């Protein structure tokens, strides 16, 4: 049985490969990063970010436009975990009573309203297929976000 440090090193190599593959497939991804800790080395997170670090609102990376994926190497699963938020347009607030008192909505919620299906938990067969699934989902969500916000820096919805 491998030690925790060995598991982190082994998983980090796989994550670097996955991040490289995602970066190649996603033209709107400015950076792809991962995190893997000693506390539970088999569960790692990949963040596909659509903003440059200097463009983060208030300099905080959690305020960015990103998708986070959870990769479990022990259970061999890949799933969507969370995303960044976009300010709602005034048109959406007027037309939808559920959104009237909200300031923001998640990127995935905006994409779901545009007809994109949510990513389901899937099996991690190999690095290439998992990276392709994550990249495809990121591209679909970003297409809906670009339509909603009219492009970079994806800050607020625009009335159309």
Feature map (PLM): residue ranges:
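Short, extreme N-terminal segment that most often corresponds to the first beta-strand
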Residues: 1-23, 27, 151, 157-159
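Compositionally biased regions
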Residues: 2, 13, 20, 36, ...
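N-terminal non-cleavable signal-anchor helices
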Residues: 9, 33, 48-49, 66, ...
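N-terminal cationic leader/targeting segments used for protein routing and processing
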Residues: 12, 31, 43, 53, ...
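Amphipathic, interaction-prone secondary-structure segments
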Residues: 19-84
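Mixed-charge, Lys/Arg-enriched low-complexity segments
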Residues: 84-160
């Amino acid at each position: 049985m491998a030690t925790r440090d060995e598991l982190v090193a082994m998983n980090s190599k796989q994550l670097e490969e996955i991040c490289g593959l995602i970066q190649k497939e996603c033209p709107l991804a400015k950076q792809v990063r991962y995190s893997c800790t000693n506390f539970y080395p088999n569960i790692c997170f990949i963040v596909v970010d659509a903003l440059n670090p200097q463009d983060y609102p208030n300099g905080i990376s959690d305020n960015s436009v990103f998708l986070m994926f959870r990769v479990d190497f022990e259970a061999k699963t890949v799933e969507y975990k969370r995303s960044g938020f976009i300010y709602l347009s005034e048109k959406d607030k007027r037309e939808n009573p559920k959104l009237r008192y909200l300031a923001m909505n998640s990127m995935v919620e905006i994409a779901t309203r545009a007809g994109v299906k949510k990513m389901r938990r899937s099996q991690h067969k190999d690095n290439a297929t998992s990276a392709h699934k994550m990249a495809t989902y990121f591209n679909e969500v970003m297409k809906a976000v670009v339509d909603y916000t009219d492009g970079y820096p994806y800050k607020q919805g625009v009335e159309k």
